[in-house]
């Protein structure tokens, strides 16, 4: 009887140890795949062709103008490490593969003007362009970069009923007239920008990224559920992408596609957009804006689109 009791005690002890190990392993796995979002180290984003920066693009005076929201304003990083700053010139600690790849290297008569405002919506961007972007001399060519519309969607994070300019939580039906208004507003903004540059300009318009990596679960980032969120995001991006066909001199920068797999599900290898070559998080702590590596990637995406049209500058 004593031996049976001893064996039973040992069995129970082994079972407790096994269950404890299982619990620890499960907890670690949960943290690994659901909570930990490694930002990674080193350069991020696609390669930019160095050969495109071997000779000047233009001898004209060129003004790089930034418009829109906090992504273009560079929220969360130093001025030199936002995508606008990196477009203009390389920071002192530039990655080796990007040294010498910036606009100042290929535009000898080059200036910058960043009018982007953190937290602003597309409704405010119309006002900013109207009141703050002055008409330029006919000798000046404009390279204009803009991110707009993202704050229209994510504000006010479900803390108040959805409305135009703060649509979080809206149904697609409710948002339909707001999307239509955004299309008209964007067309108006493009027209105003082009009017400000009688000597010509090219607008590079970033589309809107999706921190949920195509899953649509804002609650995974601590936000309320939004069943129609991805549908509305797709409609907004559809408006942005259509802009390049509605007007000449407009290029869309595919930020959303590049950032899929670098959002809140970046560590989950079973997801459709998992990036095995770089399963890291490119967003800041506020979810709205990129982190330093995200800004690096955006800079590269804009430069790639600029290279495609450099001969027209």
What is each PLM-predicted segment?
Residues 63-67, 72-74, 111-116, 142-147, ...:
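Structural recognition of the beta-strand scaffold that forms the well-ordered cores
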Residues 73, 155-177, 210-234:
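Serine-dependent acyl-ester chemistry module
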Residues 1-67, 71-91, 104-106, 139, ...:
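N-terminal secretory targeting modules
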Residues 126, 179, 183, 187, ...:
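Short, amphipathic alpha-helical "lid/cap" segments that border enzyme active or binding sites
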Residues 98-111, 185-202, 235-254, 305:
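A structural motif corresponding to the C-terminal end of an alpha-helix
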Residues 46-65, 125-144, 188-199, 303:
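Short amphipathic alpha-helices and their capping/turn segments at secondary-structure boundaries
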Residues 208-313:
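Catalytic His-Asp segment of secreted/periplasmic serine-dependent ester chemistry enzymes
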Residues 77-184:
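Conserved SGNH/GDSL esterase-like catalytic core that processes O-acyl groups on lipids
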